[in-house]
Amino acid sequence: MARMQESADLLKCSFCGKSQKQVKKLIAGGGVYICDECIELCNEIIEEELGAAQAEADEEKEMRLPRPSEISAFLDKYVIGQDQAKRVLSVAVYNHYKRIKAEEAAGLEGRRKKAQDEEVEISKSNILMLGPTGSGKTYLAQTLARLLDVPFAIADATSLTEAGYVGEDVENILLKLLQAADFDVERAQHGIIYVDEVDKISRKSENPSITRDVSGEGVQQALLKILEGTVAAIPPQGGRKHPNQEFIQLDTTNILFIVAGAFAGLDKVISERVGKKGVGFGAKLETKDEKESVDFFSQVRPEDLVKFGLIPEFIGRLPVVATVDNLDRESLVKVLVEPKNSLVKQYQRLFSMDGAELHFEDEALEAIAELALERKTGARGLRAIMEELLVPIMYDLPDREDIASVHITQDCVTDGGEPEFVYSDEAKESA
């Protein structure tokens, strides 16, 4: 009995030397032993080293800011055309985050000293995007945020009203960004906010309003501070502010605002200024195609936007102007097939989950694009057309194991014809 006890005492941890009696568990393997305490210590060391390596990798990733050419190339994978807008956006976004990184690297004291010595302080450059509905404005902004891995929020300017009136306060825009950042204030302060339909908050006339314009000029005035940079008090639950409510303080200085709208009618304002509009018997009459071929938005000036209904202070806080063009039929066909996550690829993936292939004739794609042009919905309307076309097929497909592939023809799009089905070999043999 004494010998057995002695042999038990001989079993020791090969790392710390403690006997089997001194530890809770001793694990054997290949002539060596390790106790539970040493296992726990090893785990702590590994976790600490992995954590440090991960933190270093995260810091390196955070420091890596893509160049304008890389940003534009990334946008090319997802957005068709709009080359000029991509270049403007790429440079603006690059400069915005380059400014932030430089300031963070210098620190507050260094930044003050630099401002005193060099008298150069780089101001924030928010972006104004002009272009028709369905031309890719929102998608460009979303894709930028995805590349930069920053929080992104979309707000509709038409739902906003001046403080004290029924509707949303402008601070609710910031709440959406906080929610997108999981209420991480530091991360939210480097995010992107996209304000759509800003043309709908233009004031009713070019002259300053005597009466209150709570959904137009009033909203523009309310947006001024957060566009320029201020510490805003955000109610965590949204809604109106109450005196006894706790607020989250959010600095908007480094938030990039992309403000966009279709600006229907702005082309007329620009054409009057540039003298394209003739008067009298000698005036040249332009056809509809000729009018559309003139790219008026690229010639926009601040005075045109003032005449349209934006206040000068608002325009001054949006120094970068990017214009997007109407998509023609050829561009819409490319939108359907070329981007990394194009609609055709998405529906082909859905069909493959039910064991069938999906193919489109070139003529069918052109007919879909033509339909979007007729509806004046641009790229945004393509999905609705695809749904109308494919829902009846997708309804029956899960019950039809005999279908190997589906071919969409022009007749399917234009006249509601039946698609062409190719059946599996097993189905043919059984038939």
UniProtKB/Swiss-Prot annotation:
Superkingdom of the source species: Bacteria
Pfam families for the chain: AAA_2, ClpB_D2-small, zf-C4_ClpX
Keywords, alphabetical: ATP-binding, Chaperone, Metal-binding, Nucleotide-binding, Zinc
Domain ClpX-type ZB, first and last residues per copy: 1-54
Molecular-function GO term, any one: ATP hydrolysis activity
UniProt GO cellular component terms: HslUV protease complex
RNA-binding recorded as keyword: no
Binding site for ATP: P132, T133, G134, S135, G136, K137, T138, Y139
Listed GO biological process terms: cell division; proteolysis involved in protein catabolic process
Residues the record lists as binding Zn(2+): C13, C16, C35, C38
Function comment: ATP-dependent specificity component of the Clp protease. It directs the protease to specific substrates. Can perform chaperone functions in the absence of ClpP.
Quaternary structure note: Component of the ClpX-ClpP complex. Forms a hexameric ring that, in the presence of ATP, binds to fourteen ClpP subunits assembled into a disk-like structure with a central cavity, resembling the structure of eukaryotic proteasomes.
Family (UniProt): Belongs to the ClpX chaperone family.
Record protein name field: ATP-dependent Clp protease ATP-binding subunit ClpX
Gene from which this protein is expressed: clpX
